[in-house]
């Protein structure tokens, strides 16, 4: 199996509910009871895999994106892709941890759990069973900016998915007994996902320091003290405030037409009344006035360093080309085995066992450019920080060669093309852009914007944003291992990004 095939197989697994890791700093997990035979699982998987493993060029032949809005304010976005009789159906709510009140961190994620705990029409646990019996897979995810629910299934079952989703948009029970059980699941999830994982602790602590005022400083899964104090009324209040058609976007990608989807959307979501949404009062992040660092002491085998620089995002009115140049900068540093960090720190100097750079410009709040690395035995996290700084200084002083940039561009564009061959990835792109307040036309513009980035622009964004005045550094100081970390998530874990 070639690298491209492995990548497409991974995308297909992600699309049908396998554990996946969408980014360096966000893990996605959920265990859902599946009451169906191995044969049905195999058939569903092969059906979906066939949809994702056609030639990459097929993605460009797909129909254009069609967007509509129901009278109640719900957005409906459809992208036809007729390569297989499959649809990916996603309902996105523009509410995440960014919208939580102080003292209730984690409630967006807890509510995501509760929406699988039944309505008057669909008892607890039945949602996933019904989708499974129809030959599909369902899942959900919570992030800083949004909460999403999705199903991947045969196109003939789209109406079933929309009926179930419209039901829980307004009829979720959020019963006290189910909440009491589920909050314990979430607390155990936090222990497994963060408290027992030293690098996750480093990332959590860095965010809390780097964002002084903005709610991005809070973990999506919530602080343990807030989870322990959370009441069922908190989840109900959050649900009643934010789960409304005028705060939701339906995204469907697959073997359907826009007319078919819109007809079903009107049937199932049209009768739901719009709501007056709460006023979003999000504290703006003050300007950082100097570098800051912190040390996290936790049981671990190796040290680790994580660096975060304040950076713009696509929705910033003055950003223009800068987010695309930052994307190219991340690829120059860490786009492949021959990229600068791996070539210099790992293979030549051998002071790091791994080193990475990452940037994500799709967000409702302020952005970050991350560098991270694990030192080799005998080296410290602070020594590795200096080496990372040295690579940045060298790039700023000497610039990026045109040959280097063209190689990175080719790889980035190829990766984007193959990712777009996945129906699930297409739906993810459309939904995440919508939640950030960005037009879906950016999907088609993305490759051209990357191609237009110049070597001077890559150097310029490095010089402008990778500076001490916007830097926060977190070091992991490994402590003796006191016990074995759980190898698998606890039962009932759902998505939290």
Predicted regions located by residue number:
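Acidic, Ala/Val/Gly-enriched low-complexity intrinsically disordered segments
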Residues: 3, 12-15
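Residue-identity detector for glycine
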Residues: 7, 15-17, 57
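Bacterial N-terminal signal peptides that target proteins for export
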Residues: 7-11, 21, 29-45
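Bacterial N-terminal signal peptides
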Residues: 42-54
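Non-catalytic beta-strand/loop surface segments
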Residues: 57-97, 121-157, 193-247, 271-316, ...
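Short, polar/flexible loop-turn hinges at active-site or ligand-entry regions and domain interfaces
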Residues: 117-122, 169-177, 193, 400-401
